[in-house]
Amino acid sequence: MIIIAACGNKQAVAPAEGDEARMVNEQAKDYYAAIDRYLSEQIAGQYAPGEYSVPVYQEVAVDDSDSTDIRIWGDFWVYNYKQEGDTLKCVSGGSHPGLMHVCQKGEYFYVSDFEQVEDGSRFLPSAKRIFGEYFETFQIHHSDGDEHESLKHDVLRAFVRDHGLTATWYQDYGWPAKEL
């Protein structure tokens, strides 16, 4: 299992429509960067905005045998943060497990489709349908809160470093702050 941790754009951006979204995502030069941009620009805008949008995801499986439909199954999360003093405080975010379809056009990649697992009583049947042979692997990682928290910690530490932020702590709503 490869764990992918990615940092998104500085601001949460409201979703764009149709081909505009694809043109923005075409700026990504590899499919992981395309996923980061998609999560930051299309998914993060579904939540209350923060100063920073930070995608965190675990790759479950990849099929990159066809550059016109690279398929990445994963447990995709988006967190929106605002900085207060030395602490990044989570203002919103959520989980979006599913299957990303990424297309290569020339040297650029963009997300062409995202099949998301449904909520509520449809979660299990839709997860089984979308993840198929990778369902058990998905379940193991999706159910491991400690693994996700460790991954999120590492992603946030890299995000703070890469963006020159002064934060030394992060805090999820209702929980004590944790050191980066």
Regions found by a protein language model. Give the residues of each.
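Low-complexity, intrinsically disordered terminal/linker segments enriched in charged
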Residues: 112-180
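Mature extracytoplasmic domains of secretory-pathway proteins
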Residues: 56-121
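Soluble non-cytosolic domains of exported or imported proteins
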Residues: 25-29, 89-92, 146
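N-terminal export/targeting and maturation segments
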Residues: 10-77
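C-terminal motif of bacterial Sec signal peptides marking the signal peptidase cleavage site
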Residues: 3-6
